[in-house]
Regions:
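Short, small-residue-biased leader/transition segments that mark boundaries at the very start
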Residues: 1-8
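Catalytic donor nucleotide-activated moiety binding site of glycosyltransferases and closely related
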Residues: 38-46, 51, 69-72, 76-117
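Short, flexible/disordered intra-domain loops and linkers
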Residues: 46-61, 113-122, 144-147
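Well-ordered, non-membrane alpha-helical segments in soluble/globular domains
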Residues: 55-74, 124
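Donor nucleotide-activated moiety binding/catalytic core segment of transferases
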Residues: 62-64, 104-141
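A donor-sugar binding/catalytic signature common to diverse glycosyltransferases
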Residues: 125-168
């Protein structure tokens, strides 16, 4: 609801720590608005989450990457004067997407439940979440091989943004 969104915007429930604000300020994101694009692969491209099996053949992995890159190219074309910031749980994809004119934030990618370096991973998770919440558009890219995440959905809710989906 609008009232709930106002509570989030005023940061009555969630207030970033000084450390988180410092990390966000280092991101150099356009204050006039940027588009956040979020993709959640789980183990579709690499195996980093224990007991989460989504093993694809090399051909199917490449096909999925190409479909996602095509989707991001479409988003770039539709948002010519905006920064496009890509968020993902896949190191492989974040490296591949750098061929496009997009921003990928620094930090250790991982899932808090599956890592030993939890502080660095947790900070990256919070930076991503808050950066997504401050975007002017939030687009979640989905495919049958990908995880139907709500991470970016809730970040959009925090920012009072209507989340969008692009199926590839």
């Amino acid at each position: 609801s609008s009232a709930a969104s106002d509570v989030y915007k005023r940061q009555e429930l969630f207030k970033p720590s000084q450390a988180l604000n410092e990390c966000l300020n280092c991101c150099s994101l356009d204050s006039s608005g940027y588009v956040a694009v979020h993709l959640r692969f789980v183990n579709a491209l690499e195996n980093f989450e224990k007991d989460q099996f989504n093993s694809l053949t090399e051909d199917k992995r490449e096909n999925l990457i190409q479909r996602c890159l095509k989707g991001i190219r479409l988003i770039i074309d539709q948002n010519k004067n905006k920064q496009i910031v890509v968020f993902s749980d896949s190191k492989v994809f974040l490296e591949r997407v750098k061929v496009l004119p997009v921003i990928v934030l620094d930090g250790k990618v991982g899932h808090i439940s599956f890592t030993e370096n939890t502080h660095e991973v947790a900070m990256k998770t919070f930076v991503d979440f808050y950066a997504i919440s401050k975007a002017c558009r939030v687009i979640r890219i989905l495919a049958p091989e990908m995880y139907n995440t709500v991470f970016s959905y809730y970040a959009a809710v925090l920012g009072g943004i209507i989340p969008e989906e692009l199926h590839v």
